[in-house]
């Protein structure tokens, strides 16, 4: 009898929560588990804020934190996660191409402005020839850093697209030395470089605030329109009701308010 009840509860959990108000009370009290990989900041913090709202819908959110940009995609593709939340679509698309994974963006949740932070040099007006600027070493985020340098008038590029590399620099009047560093290490590189262009989440982990950056991406820039962070899932899972419920809550007014107030400009809700 217990086995029959358990199976029945499982079936009800799959069809009875989410967009129509959650699981019913009574004997079927077991929550559906939803396992989501995330960067510690801000993604895991945002998910923790969403967890109680999901619980009301009969969904237990299990958050798995990752310190890098590779393992959460590997784990999702292998079926160890139901979704992940740490990356933008260009990075995910490039990862799919490079690794042969089959991941897709289910929804755009928020945008993290890239910031250029002072290291050994305190402001752009004090910039000297041969200054060292550290940038992310992955393809899409390095392009984003180069576009920010271009927007500050520090370099000129032969094209202004999201696949630019250092080879596309046609003018570098200050002779900037651009060093590629793994994104998680950028904040730590500040004592050794003049400036570092840092991903929003790693800037926050390094206790850096967007308001203190010497330059940031504009909210109406190409980057802002392109690099919103997504809920990524395996291809074919887009219609799972528990994932739809997660997206609905992350895009709710309550979560948007949390992002704005908690992160002070470091996290901008996606439109």
State where each predicted segment sits.
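A bilobed periplasmic-binding-protein/Venus flytrap-type ligand-binding module shared by bacterial periplasmic
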Residues: 113-124, 227-240
């Amino acid at each position: 009898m217990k086995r029959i009840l358990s199976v029945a509860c499982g079936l009800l959990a799959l069809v009875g929560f989410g967009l129509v108000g959650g699981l019913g009370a009574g004997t079927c009290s077991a929550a559906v588990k939803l396992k989501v990989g995330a960067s510690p900041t801000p993604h895991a913090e945002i998910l923790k804020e969403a967890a109680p709202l999901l619980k009301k819908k009969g969904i237990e959110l299990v958050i798995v934190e990752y310190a890098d940009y590779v393992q959460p995609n590997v784990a999702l593709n292998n079926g160890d996660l139901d979704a992940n939340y740490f990356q933008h679509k260009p990075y995910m698309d490039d990862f799919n191409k490079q690794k042969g994974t089959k991941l897709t963006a289910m929804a755009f949740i928020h945008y993290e402005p890239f910031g250029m932070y002072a290291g050994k040099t305190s402001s752009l007006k004090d910039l000297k020839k041969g200054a060292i600027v550290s940038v992310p070493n992955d393809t899409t985020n390095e392009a984003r850093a180069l576009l920010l340098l271009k927007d500050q008038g520090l370099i000129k590029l032969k094209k202004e697209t999201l696949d630019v590399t250092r080879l596309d620099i046609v003018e570098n009047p200050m002779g900037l030395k651009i060093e590629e560093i793994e994104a998680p290490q950028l904040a730590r590189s500040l004592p050794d470089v003049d400036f570092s262009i840092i991903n929003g989440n790693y800037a926050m982990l390094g206790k850096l605030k967007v308001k203190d950056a010497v330059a940031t991406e504009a909210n109406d820039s190409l980057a802002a329109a392109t690099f919103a962070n997504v809920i990524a899932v395996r291809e074919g899972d887009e219609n799972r009701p528990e994932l739809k419920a997660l997206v609905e809550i992350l895009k709710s007014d309550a979560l948007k308010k949390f992002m704005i107030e908690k992160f002070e400009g470091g996290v901008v809700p996606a439109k």
